[in-house]
């Protein structure tokens, strides 16, 4: 039996937006069963709620952003990834700005916040999206694909012409029946190249970026004094992003995901293509007395 989960307590954090550079106050609150993840812009009058829904994605340039009722919520993918990795279904995310705080560029601080708040099971079974048929989307040589699989696994391949990202460190697979999100994925940070800085600044992107919240590379090396957290941290972060982007489908995935040079835009296109093909997926749950789901989550943390 796998139940829905929410937070036991409310918890708050402060940070800066990666792209806006704005200071942002964030509050995570418990939510009732079947509520889902809902963002709330408390700086607006009246307050505007924006559900975590793939159909509301309007921004995929260097982040995943949502728009609803005139309100924007930017850079949701790292928190969404942490929620997916810890199996949290229902939460209210209050924000004082249009962008989530970037924290250290990974999902690790969000995992810490969620565990500090306490994670509790609720009265109704968790709902999974089971992949029944292969769904694939492409953009040039980029590919993102769902396939049926009894569990949840992700494979990702990146290609960067850079000495710090050799081919042998450009491929990663993770299966959540045997691997732990917290240790294997959550600490992988976002990354960027000095050569792209001018492009980003011209578009008012990356204004809050620094070596405190991203891996920065020049033409030859990593510039961060502390180096990398994993030898293949770059591709692990791409998996972290994908987990967050896919959680916008509205439920935990039971299936296999494969990405080749994919990013936020193609991940969102894949989720939309899946949801539009009703023969390709189904809702499933595992009530008491039935089989266990073929994916494991950490035990609830009762703070």
Swiss-Prot record:
Gene3D superfamilies reported in the protein's UniProt record: lpxc deacetylase, domain 1 (3.30.230.20), lpxc deacetylase, domain 2 (3.30.1700.10)
Gene Ontology terms describing biological process: lipid A biosynthetic process
InterPro entries: Ribosomal_Su5_D2-typ_SF (IPR020568), UDP-acyl_GlcNac_deAcase (IPR004463), UDP-acyl_GlcNac_deAcase_C (IPR011334), UDP-acyl_N-AcGlcN_deAcase_N (IPR015870)
Reactions performed catalytically: a UDP-3-O-[(3R)-3-hydroxyacyl]-N-acetyl-alpha-D-glucosamine + H2O = a UDP-3-O-[(3R)-3-hydroxyacyl]-alpha-D-glucosamine + acetate
Pathway: Glycolipid biosynthesis; lipid IV(A) biosynthesis; lipid IV(A) from (3R)-3-hydroxytetradecanoyl-[acyl-carrier-protein] and UDP-N-acetyl-alpha-D-glucosamine: step 2/6
Record keywords: Hydrolase, Lipid A biosynthesis, Lipid biosynthesis, Lipid metabolism, Metal-binding, Zinc
Family: Belongs to the LpxC family.
Protein name stated in the entry: UDP-3-O-acyl-N-acetylglucosamine deacetylase
